Amino acid sequence: MSIIKSFSVGLGDMYYIKHGSENFTMIDCCLKPENREAIVKEIKEEKKGKDITRFISTHPDGDHIQQLDYFDDEVEILNFYCVKNEATKTSETNSFKRYCELRDSSKAFNVFKGCKRKWMNDDGPDSNGKELGSSGINILWPDTSNEEYKAELQKAKDGTAFNNISCIIQYKLKNSVTAVWMGDLETNFMESIKDEVSLQKTNILFAPHHGRKSGKIPQEWLDTMNPDIIVMGEANSKDSDYASYPNHNKIRQNSAKDITFECESGKVHIYSSNENYTADFLTNENKSTFDYYIGSMDV
């Protein structure tokens, strides 16, 4: 069994995966003074006892690294996964300064399409001979030889744009869930690389760019993934791309607030921190592991 948690952090992203193996994964950071103590406390508690912890930064846009310095000071990031980049910003926040420190440190591992790493997607023993198991995470993008991607890396180096250096992350739990994150990839860029990314049936898709119209997913990708649920981020209603996915079930984070996915063999049970949130496409299996169960789905 594993737990996927999507925090409600406004116009930003922050997640963790508590794996059934000896792994704990955090994806992106968006903290504020009013939420940071509670979120950090939860992450500290949930990662207790895990031998391998990693933080994956999809890209260095401000709402994905917000208060990363505070988070790192409190949690202590030991393994920092990011795409290889030389992003700069004219006005450097403490968050971006910490991102650069981690990016350029010995803690960094540069992710790319098809990369292998022990305990990320390879099993193996630790230095004491203990078998830790794989996290089930694979990186589907970027292809670092792709010319369109190289152009986006240059924009990041010039400090003009960062969204399209986002990596695509896939998490697979054996006989259970497949989930995909796409950072803040934008529609035009996704269209330019749509034949370069190998996707498959997906149960939970976290919509790129917080569910904005600017992150509309290519139809070819949607057809291939055929997601059971698309989680729409907290984009403003005027920017939301909700109407572009009429044939897919959706959970709106701006209504559901924190979303917890309890993933077990053949099933995903879903909980919302909003006790009044409902999702009529889910079945009721009367689960109660967490507060405010909203339903389950077969996977």
Range-by-range predicted roles:
Residues 65-74, 90-100, 217-220, 241-246:
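Metal-dependent catalytic neighborhoods of phosphoester/phosphodiester hydrolases
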Residues 25, 33-87, 196-212, 223-230:
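Active-site metal-binding motif and surrounding structural segment of the metallo-beta-lactamase
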Residues 11, 32-34, 60-65, 87-90, ...:
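Active-site environment of divalent metal-dependent phosphoester hydrolases
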Residues 106-109, 117, 245-252:
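Active-site regions of enzymes building and remodeling cell-envelope glycoconjugates
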Residues 56-60, 64, 82-86, 92-95, ...:
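Divalent cation-coordinating acidic motifs and surrounding scaffolds
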Residues 1-50, 113-201, 257-299:
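Core dinuclear metal-dependent hydrolase active-site scaffold
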Residues 35, 39, 64-67, 92-102, ...:
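Stable alpha-helical elements in mature extracytoplasmic
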